[in-house]
């Protein structure tokens, strides 16, 4: 487990004070750098030792067959797996004739710092070779947020105490060996030497390698160039082969003298462009990087992040761990999305190969809501990517005998890649999640152009899907049968409340959008009768409720299922230790489902219903998904269980910084990183938008004395500053001088020239805090109990 001893809690950086080889893979994920197009895992500069080497290009993948013991109609035949592309991070250092390797000689000191404001990873190492020669190595790495195709590394070697001859080999390496993976289905499939050489060339101080995939027919280019500064004589040579290019720098250093190398990297890929065009694109990016220079790249990186933090920062007084974690999470969300530009945001970002690099409902459901308030330009690009796959989604729906569009449960380029349909294709709610993301973007930004550009078609086709999936019974009630909600331990059910409410929202949203764009809707074949049918279905959707228990049923009949024996089944996650045929017919819940419905469709439940539902479902949720803790934090906060909510917020925030699920090695959990913001801002800040108006109603737990957060709303920058007695709203620059929002159910008009301060609304819980299944209390509570 990652501990505070080696990773101290600091507000604006993640710092590793000593190197633990047993945690290399985890630290490589934490220290990953990305801009949404290029992703570099935080591997050591010298390439070895490593936990999992990784260099990724967004949506650059290979196709592999999906094997079935018993295949059926409609099963996807091929899967998609992210490819580890050409590694440009490597600097091999020889001191005399001995390679710098942290496993040999003496590592006198070692430190790595991820700077969340500078957008850089800095490493400082002091090493004594087996022969007694000492050097200090300092490297700083960045993936440019300002220049999409560019990464760069500054590598400095300093001689200590005596003269040393140093040799630095700066490399581009393709088809690296990757370690064996586990049988865990959440871990990536292995691809053996996935790239075929196309072309290679070299210059005096650089090289370029081009490769393509075999089955997906994607082509990529990776190039490097170097600047070298050193006192005295230096020899520089470059050679290139199909899978390896190397620039070698040899010099002698007296004590205190330094060799400084700046390595510029450029990456690009395409499924359409010619070899010369792709080669020239990479070469042009390299020239542009050298023109900017190392300092220019640093300055542009800082400026980009300064602007982001001005709209996104969250300050948490009283809880330094959550303070560090929420900034860490926001930083990685920005990295995953900033320059993705009409490509997917994978569930692991570009930090690892977990889940094969696929995007799920996590993107629209958890990541985009945060970015809509903090980096809306990235959301628009992510939604454009999803809309670009609409034709594939329509083909998938037709294959399944349905109308409209059926978006894939997991994918890289738009085709369904889930081999397990009960927890894949049957999770139809992803279509409504996508529709809600389009609607939230329109409401929060006030920008209707994206809906007109591509959102309307998505809303219409997803509405058509729901109408063909559902049916009215003889009493006129509308049902959805054979669906799976967010809880994957209760699959293929009737009338999952979350799915039905989200489908109803999708249907109403589509009808409303057609009224805003009548000519475009008519061109897509929408009639008045079709819109009326959408609204009829939405208004008649069945929402199961157990009158005797006074709670909503997660799905029809859920509260009558057998109770799960939590005392006898204590090895988690259950998906790796229990058969689905035992999980499906029992009241055991993988992750927030009905509870998530109360967050996303808050207006559909009364305060009393929320309190009783939280009390019932808390006792049955095991949180075998990283998506659950943030939602439980939000709803526990809303019903008044503030300390329990704080524990869930801690768990959501620290899932990767403390490796709470023991799988950070495979990449970071983007949705849970988003969940840190959600738990704090939506949970304790009381942010809601499901009724089309900005509503903020904060209430803080005892462990947080002050919560101050920034967000964007319809062109305004808003600062919310809450403590235990009052909340202050500061309206910044925007399209006008005033904004009407809602606080504690009452309209409040803010003015740009005057902060508004109002007393917080105190809430008393209707019920005492509920217990959790044995051994599944929030992580922080268990730690405090020891």
From Swiss-Prot:
Region Disordered, residue ranges: 762-786
Protein name: Uncharacterized glycosyl hydrolase Rv3401
Keyword Transmembrane helix: no
Keyword Nuclease: no
Active site: 488 (proton donor)
EC number: 3.2.1.-
Family statement drawn from the similarity comment of this UniProt entry: Belongs to the glycosyl hydrolase 65 family.
SUPFAM superfamilies attached to this UniProt entry: Galactose mutarotase-like (SSF74650), Six-hairpin glycosidases (SSF48208)
GO molecular function, one term: carbohydrate binding
Cellular component, GO, one term: plasma membrane
Positions of substrate binding: 361-362, 590-591
The entry's keywords: Glycosidase, Hydrolase
Biased composition (Pro residues): 766-776
One of the protein's GO biological processes: carbohydrate metabolic process
């Amino acid at each position: 487990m990652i501990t505070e001893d080696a990773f101290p809690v600091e507000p604006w950086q993640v710092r590793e004070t000593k190197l633990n080889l047993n945690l290399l893979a985890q630290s490589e994920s934490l220290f990953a750098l990305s801009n949404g197009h290029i992703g570099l895992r935080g591997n050591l500069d010298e390439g070895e030792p490593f936990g999992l080497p990784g260099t990724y290009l967004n949506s650059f993948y290979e196709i592999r067959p999906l094997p079935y013991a018993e295949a059926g109609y409609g099963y996807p035949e091929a899967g998609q797996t992210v490819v580890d592309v050409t590694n440009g991070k490597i600097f091999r250092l020889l001191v005399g004739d001995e390679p710098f390797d942290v496993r040999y000689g003496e590592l006198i000191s070692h430190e790595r710092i991820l700077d969340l404001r500078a957008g850089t990873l800095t490493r400082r190492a002091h090493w004594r070779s087996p022969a007694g020669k000492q050097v200090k190595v300092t490297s700083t790495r960045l993936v440019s947020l300002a220049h999409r195709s560019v990464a760069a590394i500054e590598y400095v070697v300093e001689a200590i105490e005596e003269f040393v001859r140093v040799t630095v080999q700066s490399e581009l390496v393709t088809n690296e060996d990757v370690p064996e993976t586990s049988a865990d289905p959440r871990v990536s499939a292995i691809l053996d030497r996935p790239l075929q050489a196309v072309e290679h060339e070299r210059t005096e101080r650089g090289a370029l390698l081009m490769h393509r995939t075999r089955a997906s027919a994607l082509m990529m280019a990776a190039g490097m160039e170097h600047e070298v500064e050193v006192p005295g004589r230096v020899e520089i040579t470059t050679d290139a082969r199909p899978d390896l290019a190397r620039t070698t720098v040899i010099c002698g250093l007296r004590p205190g003298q330094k060799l400084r190398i700046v390595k510029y990297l450029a990456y690009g890929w395409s499924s359409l462009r010619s070899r010369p065009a792709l080669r020239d694109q990479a070469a042009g990016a390299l020239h542009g990087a050298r023109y900017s220079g190392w300092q220019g790249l640093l300055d542009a990186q800082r400026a980009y992040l300064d602007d982001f933090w001005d709209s996104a920062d969250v300050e948490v007084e009283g809880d330094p761990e959550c303070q560090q974690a929420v900034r860490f999470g926001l930083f990685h969300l920005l990295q995953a999305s900033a320059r993705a530009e009409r490509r997917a945001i994978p569930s692991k970002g570009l930090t690892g190969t977990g889940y094969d690099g696929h995007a799920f409902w996590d993107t629209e459901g958890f990541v985009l809501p945060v970015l809509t308030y903090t980096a809306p330009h990235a959301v628009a690009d992510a939604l454009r990517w999803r809309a670009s796959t609409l034709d594939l989604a329509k083909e998938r729906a037709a294959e399944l005998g349905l109308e409209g569009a059926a978006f894939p449960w997991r994918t890289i380029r738009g085709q369904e890649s889930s081999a397990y349909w009960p927890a894949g294709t049957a999770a139809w709610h992803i279509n409504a999640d996508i529709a809600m993301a389009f609607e939230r973007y329109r409401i929060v930004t006030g920008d209707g152009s994206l809906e007109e550009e591509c959102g309307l078609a998505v809303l219409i086709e997803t509405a058509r899907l729901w109408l063909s999936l559902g049916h009215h019974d003889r009493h006129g009630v509308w049902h959805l049968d054979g669906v799976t909600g967010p809880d994957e331990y209760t699959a293929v059910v009737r009338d999952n409340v979350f799915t039905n409410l989200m489908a109803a929202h999708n249907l109403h949203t589509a009808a409303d959008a057609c009224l805003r764009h009548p000519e475009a809707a008519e061109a897509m074949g929408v009639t008045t009768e079709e819109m009326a049918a959408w609204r009829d279905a939405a208004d008649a959707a069945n929402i199961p409720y157990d009158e005797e228990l006074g709670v909503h049923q997660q799905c029809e009949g859920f509260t009558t299922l057998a109770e799960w024996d939590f005392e006898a089944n204590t090895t988690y996650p259950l998906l790796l230790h229990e058969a689905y045929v035992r999980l499906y017919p029992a009241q055991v819940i993988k992750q927030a489902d009905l509870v998530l419905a109360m967050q996303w469709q808050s207006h559909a439940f009364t305060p009393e219903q929320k309190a009783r539902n939280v009390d019932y479902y808390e006792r049955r949720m095991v949180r075998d998904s990283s998506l659950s803790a943030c939602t439980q934090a939000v709803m526990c906060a809303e019903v008044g269980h503030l300390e329990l909510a704080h524990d869930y917020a801690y768990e959501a925030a620290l899932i990767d910084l403390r490796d709470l699920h023991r799988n950070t090695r495979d990449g970071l959990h983007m949705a849970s990183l988003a969940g840190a913001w959600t738990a704090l801002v939506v949970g304790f800040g009381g942010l809601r938008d499901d009724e089309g108006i900005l509503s903020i109603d904060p209430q803080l737990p005892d462990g947080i004395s002050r919560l101050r957060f920034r967000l964007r709303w319809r062109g305004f920058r808003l600062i919310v500053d809450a403590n235990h007695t009052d909340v202050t709203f500061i309206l910044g620059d925007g399209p006008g001088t005033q904004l009407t929002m809602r606080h504690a159910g009452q309209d409040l008009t803010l003015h740009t020239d005057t902060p508004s301060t109002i007393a917080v609304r105190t809430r008393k819980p209707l019920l005492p805090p509920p217990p959790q299944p044995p051994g599944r209390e929030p992580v922080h509570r268990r730690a405090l109990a020891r």
